[in-house]
């Protein structure tokens, strides 16, 4: 089965409500969908999301990388050389992790169809996945109301966005904790919004108030690894690296240096399933648990993350709610409350 063409389609999808973090406010996404065509009529699908504030990738650049160097190294190649093709994509250009992720996902889809197995089976596992759901940063009473609504819909784990205004963050979390049942799990994401001393002060106060926070993502700037370690070493609540980790190389440095307690893996940061698996493996050797998440992106890419999460034994936490924010999504994932339903392939419903 040989690859005959690589095509791209760009589409915009509105969100039900604005998605607000310490870094940005999102009202719509632009999905860059990738289609790898073969001489046997099989078409593999993948997708990328432009998130320049995190990855540095813009939609035009993603499209150009896919239709330029990545397409060139795939045309005429046989899918039986699957592992080599994945490597060629990573070596085709510097950076561009989102474009690489989209093509990586599409290659996996072609290969799964060639082997007639779903992605989770190809990767070697299928555990049940329940996602958290995000509460955007806002006024405390608005966040508390939103949190209560999510719990009423069956979500037991809430991911709370903080970091936009430190003096309000304690009030936000306390309002949410008081509005939901005690057994509701709360995890926080500061999206780089605090400095190291500010983070320690806020987290210690949360601990003193017994707010029972499961873990806190990226409290400080992505490049402030020393600050990340400082926070980790001065609080009891586990600290998760997110924007600080893009690659398996980053993962190795973080676990060797003890910079974080946990790692958050995203395909748009690391460049695809292959590199994500390597990150989870490296973390596992150091006894560091991983979460998988996504940017604000479409079902085509998030469903690939779900299959990865179902298969890898060191992925323990799941943040896969992005498609639930979209007003319309013609194909991809389905949910039963917080449960993520895995499809028979990356791009089709079961």
Report the location of each language-model feature.
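Glycine-rich phosphate/pyrophosphate-binding beta-alpha loops
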Residues: 48-56, 130, 134-138, 294
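N-terminal small/glycine-rich loop or linker at the start of catalytic domains
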Residues: 113-136
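Flexible C-terminal active-site loop/helix
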Residues: 4-15, 29-31, 295-350
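Conserved, mostly hydrophobic/aromatic
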Residues: 3, 34, 41, 70, ...
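Active-site mouth loops of central-metabolism enzymes
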Residues: 128-142, 190-191, 195-196, 240
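Structured beta-strand/loop patches that form or line metal/cofactor-binding pockets in enzymes
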Residues: 1-45, 49-53, 326-327
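Catalytic core of soluble alpha/beta enzymes
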Residues: 160, 167-301, 327-338
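Metal- or metallocofactor-binding catalytic centers and their adjacent structured scaffolds
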Residues: 5-7, 37-114
């Amino acid at each position: 089965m040989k690859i005959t063409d690589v095509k791209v389609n760009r589409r915009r999808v509105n969100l039900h409500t604005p998605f607000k973090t310490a870094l940005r406010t999102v009202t719509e996404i632009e999905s860059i969908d990738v289609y790898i065509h073969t001489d046997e009529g099989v078409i593999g699908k993948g997708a990328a999301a432009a998130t320049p504030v995190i990855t540095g990738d813009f939609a035009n650049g993603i499209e150009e990388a896919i239709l330029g160097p990545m397409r060139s190294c795939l045309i005429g190649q046989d899918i039986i050389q699957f592992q080599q093709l994945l490597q060629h994509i990573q070596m085709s250009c510097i950076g561009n992790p989102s474009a690489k992720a989209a093509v990586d996902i599409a290659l996996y889809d072609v290969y799964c169809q060639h082997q007639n197995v779903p992605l989770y089976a190809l990767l070697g596992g299928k555990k049940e996945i329940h996602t958290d759901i995000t509460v955007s940063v806002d006024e405390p009473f608005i966040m508390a109301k939103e949190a209560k609504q999510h719990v009423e819909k069956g979500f037991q784990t809430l991911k709370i966005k903080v970091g936009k205004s430190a003096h309000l963050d304690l009030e936000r979390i306390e309002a949410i904790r008081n509005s939901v049942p005690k057994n509701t799990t709360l995890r926080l994401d500061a999206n780089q919004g605090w400095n190291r001393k500010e983070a320690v002060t806020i987290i210690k106060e949360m601990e003193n108030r017994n707010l029972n926070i499961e873990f806190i993502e990226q409290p400080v700037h992505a490049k402030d690894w020393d600050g990340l370690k400082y926070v980790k070493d001065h609080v009891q609540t586990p600290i998760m690296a997110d924007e600080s980790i893009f690659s398996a190389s980053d993962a190795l440095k973080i676990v060797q240096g003890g910079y974080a307690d946990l790692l958050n893996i995203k395909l748009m940061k690391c460049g695809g399933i292959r590199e994500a698996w390597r990150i989870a493996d490296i973390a596992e050797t150091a006894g560091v648990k991983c979460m998988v998440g996504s940017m604000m992106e479409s079902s085509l890419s998030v469903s690939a993350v779900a299959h990865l999460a179902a298969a890898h034994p060191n992925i323990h936490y799941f943040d896969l709610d992005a498609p639930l924010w979209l007003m319309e999504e013609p194909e991809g994932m389905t949910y039963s409350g917080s449960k993520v339903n895995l499809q028979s392939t990356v791009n089709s419903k079961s």
